[in-house]
Regions:
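Sec-dependent signal peptide recognition
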Residues: 2-9
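N-terminal Sec signal peptide cleavage junction
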Residues: 16-18
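Post-signal peptide N-terminal segment of mature Sec-exported envelope proteins
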Residues: 21-55
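Acidic/histidine-rich, surface-exposed loop or edge segments in extracytoplasmic proteins
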Residues: 55-62, 250-251, 293
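Short coil-to-helix leader/linker segments, especially the first N-terminal amphipathic alpha-helix
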Residues: 63-78
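Subtilisin-like serine protease catalytic core
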Residues: 79-174, 178-182, 186-200, 205-242, ...
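Short, intrinsically disordered, charge-balanced linker/junction segments flanking boundaries
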Residues: 315, 319-324
């Protein structure tokens, strides 16, 4: 893992499998125009932490008590006691890795109450969703063989369309449980997604609770607009994999990339770097709990965290422009 000082207020952490050589000049296009990035306002509400329903080796309190975040060996704990405001506040750390799971308690806010993750972007193409025009029939729409009712919920935002649809398949996402996106115990599901334009830009809808209807679903905007996240799970249960959306416009049609960490390494690195009160345990912090994180996914989790030179270059360019 390497930390490189790029510009004032920005640190970059790159941790992934060695990049494989790409043929020139095939450098993938960025998901959004990096020259038109707007930093989100700190006043935006932080995501609401979801109930922790994952089985763990030990309770978070015990992990903290046993020193599973060993800051003493590097003197971080002594330094912060002597200089409590030198905790990373005002610094943005770009994590170039397998992504960050924004649903992990402790990756929500900084020590000063600012949002911990102001932006999440996918430069790996692992979450790219191919979208095609789709036409509803009455109060339902068929997407890849899935009939979803409650289309009136969509028409409330956009009465005339256009409407686009795509899917995300579990099998290409690697080994379970990470690939069991909807938490039903299988890894062969194909999950439909609908995209349409609202008054404030493109939005995503998904049947997140699996009830066959979009009626109770909420629109999900590009993460940069409001730090909205979503995930699939049976009603009343917490999604196992928290996702964000990258939505951009290409000549009047939407482009969608889902951002998620199906490998866990990027989230692990993020916790070490800047977690604050992990799982609600006061003081269960990373090295710089006051810092913010820029989650830039460059590695495909299903392929063991392998990345490409093009993904790294695009992410580094985005990080510098974002912090400028």
């Amino acid at each position: 893992m390497h930390s490189i000082r790029l510009v004032s207020g920005l640190a970059l952490i790159l941790a992934c499998a060695p990049a494989r050589k790409e043929p020139e000049p095939a450098i993938p296009k960025p998901n959004i125009d990096p020259g038109r990035v707007n930093r989100p306002q700190a006043a935006l509400p932080a995501p609401t932490p979801q109930a922790d329903s994952v089985q763990r080796l030990v309770p978070p309190q015990a992990a903290y008590a046993h020193g599973w975040m060993p800051l003493a060996s590097t003197g971080v704990d002594r330094f912060l006691r002597a200089h409590p405001t030198y905790d990373g506040r005002g610094v943005l750390i770009a994590i170039l890795d397998t992504g960050i799971d924004p649903g992990v308690p402790g990756l929500n806010t900084t020590t000063t109450g600012d949002p911990k993750i102001p932006d999440l972007r996918d430069f790996s193409d692992e979450g790219a969703v191919s979208l095609q025009p789709v036409a509803p029939s009455g109060d339902s729409v068929v997407i890849a063989g899935h009939r979803l009712g409650g289309f009136g919920r969509i028409r409330a935002l956009n009465t005339a369309g256009p409407y686009y649809a795509g899917t995300i398949s579990e099998i290409p996402l690697g080994q379970p449980p990470a690939s069991d996106v909807n938490g039903n115990g299988t890894v062969g599901d194909t999950l439909p997604i609908l995209v349409t334009r609202a008054s404030d830009g493109w939005v995503l809808f998904a049947d997140t609770d699996g009830d066959g209807s979009l009626a109770g679903e909420r629109p999900v905007h590009d993460y940069l607009l409001g730090r909205e996240t979503f995930g699939w799970a049976p009603r009343g249960r917490t999604p196992k994999l928290t996702m964000a959306a990258n939505l951009s416009d290409s000549a009047g049609t939407p482009r969608l990339d889902l951002v998620f960490d199906n490998f866990g390494h990027g989230t692990h690195v993020s916790g070490i770097a800047a977690a604050h009160d992990l799982y609600g345990v006061p003081g269960f912090d990373g090295v710089a709990p006051g810092a913010q994180l820029l989650g830039l996914k460059i590695a495909k989790g299903a392929q063991g965290g392998i990345t490409t030179t093009g993904s790294i270059l695009r992410a580094m360019d985005y990080a510098v422009r974002f912090a400028a």
